[in-house]
């Protein structure tokens, strides 16, 4: 009972660990121990085959050259027998026995036809839905464990790299005693050798870790089962193959359909597969090379570029050269003479300033620019017309004002009754007489205008009031036609 109680207490107190960490009783990491051998047979050391023992004959043999058989003698001549056992005198019997054992190992394949028993669909007694939540829980736990392993690996790599750096410092003896197991710290030879061993071991571990990280990155980039997809892709879906070329892939050819090629020679198989590749990807290119030492017109070497293969150099035979030369006339001509185009010669139209930076102007921008230029020209013309109209309107207003100032004098000189009772001829005569009288009554100071040039007059009287109180309008220059 006491034993069972202690076991139960241990089970209750001890926690279940998902990953084991190698630590000693003090809670420190285990030290490197180079005194005790890790393996019985060192995997890094190369094995050397000293001798071979024939189980049937029981003789020690160095090599095949030592084992000789005479035509008239059936006994084997070799080294002295090490082990006493019944040994065979005839080599043919040994070969026969080997053949018998090999024939016994062959398996006879029996062909069975599967009977098509159509079963009625029934309800699943153990559906997957019952285990779905547990499966999700374990998946999450597994992902957490993987992430924790990655973090622990990174931390361990950092720790080892720090130790290797400290071993290169002046106080490397202190770090070496903490990391490796040393029998005598005062022995300089032991300290130096173990320092070199620890550094070499740490560097190898870090190198393995980096290579593992690189491989994991490459596997993450590569899509799952990419090779299997390539083998199942049909010949029509070539863009997928050209993104990542698989030279071993043959279109419309399964690995199990080689029964047709059993009775064909290797050269015929190569020609057959080459024709398939040429049908899908295009023909191969052959470039004949001439050698200076050979006769003129004779080509001894050629560069061959087949589809989905790297180009290679071959030494041509007379048969190959003749076959290629016969194919040359059937090929299309390389160059064709094209006639000169009429619009090829440039004709000088106008001279334009080209900027230093040449930029291609799109047609849309060019049309917009032309429209804006036209609209600007139209706006300028409209402004000019409006300016002329305003000037004319101002002149007309000034004339009307002058006429209004003159009209009271006319009313004073001629009464209304006399004007209404007069005829048209009389009115015209009187108006002419009145105008002459008004001109005579005008102040002579106002009528006199100082004689000056047109430019000076415009500058002095451009929209300014003179001493006489008359507002002089600006004079507009006449444009040359």
From Swiss-Prot:
List every stretch annotated Disordered: 319-338
Question: Its GO biological process terms?
Answer: subtelomeric heterochromatin formation
Q: Which domain of life is it from?
A: Eukaryota
Give the matching InterPro entries: Cullin_homology (IPR016158), Sas4 (IPR038988), Sas4_dom (IPR029184)
Ranges in a coiled coil = 90-120, 139-160
Q: Which GO terms describe its cellular component?
A: chromatin; chromosome, telomeric region; nucleus; SAS acetyltransferase complex
Gene Ontology molecular function terms on file: acetyltransferase activity; histone acetyltransferase activity
Report, from the record, the phenotype seen after gene disruption.
Answer: Heterochromatin spreading downstream of the silent mating-type locus HMR.
Chief location bin: nucleus
Q: What else is known?
A: Present with 800 molecules/cell in log phase SD medium.
The entry's function note states: Component of the SAS complex, a multiprotein complex that acetylates 'Lys-16' of histone H4 and 'Lys-14' of histone H3. The SAS complex is however unable to acetylate nucleosomal histones. The complex is involved in transcriptional silencing at telomeres and at HML locus. Also involved in rDNA silencing. In the complex, SAS4 is essential for histone acetyltransferase (HAT) activity of the complex.
The protein's assembly and partners: Interacts with ASF1. Component of the SAS complex, at least composed of SAS2, SAS4 and SAS5. These three proteins constitute the core of the complex and are sufficient to acetylate histones.
Q: Please identify the protein, giving its name as recorded.
A: Something about silencing protein 4
**Organism whose genome encodes this protein:** Saccharomyces cerevisiae (strain ATCC 204508 / S288c) (Baker's yeast)
